[in-house]
Amino acid sequence: MYIDSHCHINFPELNEKIDEVLINMENNKISHALCVSVTLDKINEILDLTRKYSNVYASVGVHPDYEDIQEPDIETLFNYSKNEKVIAIGETGLDYFRLKGDLSW
């Protein structure tokens, strides 16, 4: 069995296809999925998915592409991590692959 360690099945373009995606995962021996948040305002959507699907887990954080969004503080991340379906912190860090220019923010 395999685990998809980084997916975004909460994105709007998959709203009508989540069941199909999860069936395809199972058919391809992917037993679990880690749905990674890109902004904290979407975490509740992801947590809803983790409640609906026993094989979906969550990662909480803010993707570095969203430098204009308030970064979460440690306490906020810690509070989310108390949920048994939150098993990772991320998106985080600096995305040197996509971002250009001054990265001092």
List where the protein language model places each region.
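Mid-domain alpha/beta scaffold segments of enzyme catalytic cores
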Residues: 1-105
